[in-house]
């Protein structure tokens, strides 16, 4: 769905933030005056999708936070804003500007979804049809809370339509376990009612809900259920119109992604759209090479740049490295130069390979790659295979099925490179050996796709990956503090029921 049709009326249904929730007007139209048809219900849900695509959520603030918090992307341009450095260096406080931007935007997504869910009963239409549309709202709510709970732990959990901010002025935090219960319930509803396929990957399907259930169960350590949900998707590839794309590069080409079969869910951008922050994508900009004149949309900003060790430790024969990282740039005179000379062409660049997944083929885009036409893929079929592999190995050490799923991804990588690398893994491995291989495969296959921090957190890898021998040593990392972000300080000032903040903040 390349364009979200958001009317002023729909935007008025959105209530954002948390304690005072920076209320947008909600009383212009009563719900019973708006929600009359399934088209009205869909229009309201489209408000959630639009809120996902804003600069303050997927367009930069949330995604850049996830990139920098992991060990695959470091700060490049040292003159970039302090709030980004704080996220990267584990020195952030409760006044961090990244968090204060995506926190209220997340609750805007949730608020719009709640309006749709609460008012679906007003629609006079076939119940099955209404439920199938409403299931999208359940998915949007679960998707957003799944990000929040992993980042913050205990959070306010609002699952009802808010018509007056006073209803939640004194809301308290909900324990993490209860938030997960709500997420699972929403995804189960979505899995039951969503169709097998949609006309666009920007709309969730039954397989999307199952894939996220698998991810949630894996995060919770329920390996049996994680395997069941992942294999439900895998065993029904044809039914759900899924496959691994033959060419890994096509997953990160804005001109290709709309027709791909691998994505289970996408967040779409139109290109050169910048009205009120909706549809604004800056991920290409912040990851692109400063001083590079290769693309007509201009140079990047060299903000989030992998450490040199990320490039050096990555098997040079693995096609995924060539797709994931740019090692050359082009001067204004047309000269192609290597990453070792990036700083010669811009004082703000750094002599390290840059993330290529978003900047290389940004499609129709504004200056510096802003406002690209990229379809970002929060969940794709490759990850489902990796979830199944990890869960099956935990259930049955060295599972041959787990090995086969990993090898499917390696085979795809070999097709791209035309070489024998990466080699297949063999059966008969010990559980720890296969576990380490699968986690490494996740790191490589899903590099820079906003997953790595969540893996570091759930596996408690912080001391290892941020230690002296890690890809990105971070001496400030504190395992007692840094697996959670701080709740925004102003929210706690306005509502003391949200106190105390997370430990260490």
UniProtKB/Swiss-Prot annotation:
Disulfide bonds: none annotated. Keywords: Cell outer membrane, Lipoprotein, Membrane, Palmitate, Signal. Induction: By ulvan and rhamnose. The keyword Membrane applies. It is found in: Cell outer membrane. InterPro entries: SusD-like_N, SusD_RagB_dom, TPR-like_helical_dom_sf. A lipid is attached at residue 18 (S-diacylglycerol cysteine). Belongs to the SusD family. Polysaccharide-binding protein probably involved in ulvan degradation. Ulvan is the main polysaccharide component of the Ulvales (green seaweed) cell wall. It is composed of disaccharide building blocks comprising 3-sulfated rhamnose (Rha3S) linked to D-glucuronic acid (GlcA), L-iduronic acid (IduA), or D-xylose (Xyl). The SusD-like protein may mediate ulvan oligomer-binding before transport in the periplasm for further degradation. This is SusD-like protein P2.
